[in-house]
A protein has these predicted regions:
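Membrane-proximal helix-turn-helix segments that form the acceptor-binding/catalytic region
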Residues: 90-109
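A charged, aromatic-enriched C-terminal amphipathic alpha-helix characteristic of glycosyltransferases
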Residues: 17, 301-328
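Aromatic "clamp/platform" in nucleotide-sugar-dependent glycosyltransferases that forms part
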Residues: 243
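Conserved acidic donor-binding segment of nucleotide-sugar-dependent glycosyltransferases
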Residues: 275-286, 293-299
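Conserved donor-binding/catalytic core segment of Leloir-type glycosyltransferases
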Residues: 158-174, 180-184, 192
Length: 332
């Protein structure tokens, strides 16, 4: 069996969570010895399409006419499109209609969580929908004290500094405004945000947040995977202040690095993240502040070993087997 992993604008998307998810797919298929190509002109048995762009839609239509089987990967929903870029809320209903048009071309649809599956079903999509996590590369994200020290050295943090990390594009949905507010309220802590997107496309509130000047706040921009791993090992707490996700890859990576974390209590995490069991959860800035202080002071016990089980369940080999089962189901 040979799979076409197709993603238009791959270079542009490479710096996003979607780009990371596609790399994970490649590693997952390698882990279970499934051959793949990224060139639609090559011979292949089944197409796995990762994006909702016009090129992807046209390719899917063309392959359907040729009798090829298609797996469409639903990484995006109307819900996680909202509160992202300028005018995203105004056009979200049109975006949803377009997603439905694309996704329903699949003989099967893959989406990362039960939550995103329910959203797709609420759109009226009747195609078979399979839940497969985006997964994590355990060999690239692991507990590494040396990597943590390198992170602190690289960004001029002292050994005694208490560091809070956030990761994501410059969009409101990712909780970047709350991250800046936490930095304002917690001047004794160091806050550093990794990730970047052009501010020209960001909403006014986000631009204001990113341009905030505080002695304890750093916007480090886009960095490579190695630096993210170092940061997750070198920080005291990783916070996922996101308001909406289809999964949240960085949470799985933080779990793999055995990083203390606080995540927002939102529906996508129901069923696999549990407050006080494998992560700590918060609903607003005040609760994030309290949880961070209690983790750093030791009032709250560390849950990193319990969180690691999340990553272990989502390692490449397991994801590869699930992808293989979906492909075989379409081809048989």
């Amino acid at each position: 069996m040979k799979v076409l992993l197709y993603t238009e604008n791959e270079k542009i998307l490479s710096k996003s969570g979607l780009g990371k998810a596609i790399k994970h797919q490649m590693n997952a298929l390698k882990a279970v010895n499934i051959e793949y190509t990224t060139n639609p002109k090559d011979d292949f048995d089944i197409a796995h399409i990762n994006f909702y762009g016009l090129k992807s839609y046209r390719l899917a239509k063309k392959l359907k006419k040729q009798g090829k089987k298609i797996v469409y990967h639903a990484h995006s929903t109307e819900e996680d499109f909202r509160n992202s870029f300028i005018f995203s809320n105004q056009v979200s209903k049109l975006f949803k209609k377009w997603l439905i048009k694309c996704y329903t071309l699949g003989d099967a649809i893959i989406t990362p969580t039960e939550y995103s599956k329910k959203l797709l079903q609420s759109y009226g999509i009747k195609n078979d929908i399979y839940v497969v996590s985006n997964g994590v590369e355990l060999k690239n994200f692991g507990h590494d004290e040396k990597a943590g020290r390198e992170f602190r050295k690289k960004y001029n943090f002292k050994k005694e500094d208490k560091i809070i990390v956030g990761i994501g594009l410059y969009i409101e949905r990712k909780g970047i405004i709350d991250f800046v507010e936490l930095a304002k309220q917690m001047p004794k802590y160091k806050f550093i945000w990794f990730g970047y997107s052009p501010l020209i496309f960001s909403r006014k509130k986000v631009r204001k947040a990113v341009n905030t000047k505080l002695n304890n706040l750093t916007f480090a921009g886009y960095v490579e995977q190695e630096t993210i791993c170092q940061a997750l090992n070198g920080c005291d707490v990783y916070i996922a202040a996101t308001y909406e996700e289809t999964e949240g890859i960085t949470i799985i990576e933080a779990a793999s690095c055995k990083t203390n974390m606080v995540v927002r209590d939102i529906p996508v995490f129901n069923g696999w993240l549990e407050n006080g069991k494998n992560v700590y959860m918060a609903r607003n800035v005040s609760e994030f502040k309290n949880k961070i202080e209690e983790i750093v002071s030791g009032e709250l016990p560390s849950l990193v070993q319990e969180a690691y089980n999340i990553a272990e369940e989502r390692k490449s080999e397991n994801i590869g087997e699930k992808l293989k089962n979906v492909y075989q189901g379409c081809l048989n």
